């Protein structure tokens, strides 16, 4: 019996919906990353993008345990001398709540060329509504 290898042409992606309200960030990111990679399918192949699309709503209400809200920082660098800036999670939650989840999921994807394509399958929205109702997403509990 030969090992099954998925082909790019045979993959039929589905859409999944995850509600982030009150869910710990790490658990949410693991679930989303596994769906995006296709790890939940029997046809998973590491070298082919077999993953599905993930819609995350209520990104502003994601839970962080402990004192991470005040202590954790995101570092940005402009490329110029003295161009390093840091922003706390609490500030990012107010301004760009989508960034927190996108950053966590990106860190859980492989560091290769396929990961850039996989990351385009993640759609994060700060509020209750999203623009992908026509795709009939399946609700996933975390």
Swiss-Prot record:
The source's domain of life comes to Bacteria
Mind telling me which GO cellular component terms the entry cites? cytosolic large ribosomal subunit
Keywords tagged on the record:
Ribonucleoprotein, Ribosomal protein
Mind listing the GO molecular function terms for this protein? mRNA binding; structural constituent of ribosome
Biological process terms in GO annotation: negative regulation of translation; translation
Q: Name one Pfam family in it.
A: Ribosomal_L13
Quaternary structure per UniProt?
Answer: Part of the 50S ribosomal subunit.
What does it do? This protein is one of the early assembly proteins of the 50S ribosomal subunit, although it is not seen to bind rRNA by itself. It is important during the early stages of 50S assembly.
> What NCBIfam families does UniProt report for this protein, alphabetically?
rplM_bact (TIGR01066)
The UniProt similarity line reads: Belongs to the universal ribosomal protein uL13 family.
Q: What is this protein called?
A: Large ribosomal subunit protein uL13
What is this protein's gene name? rplM
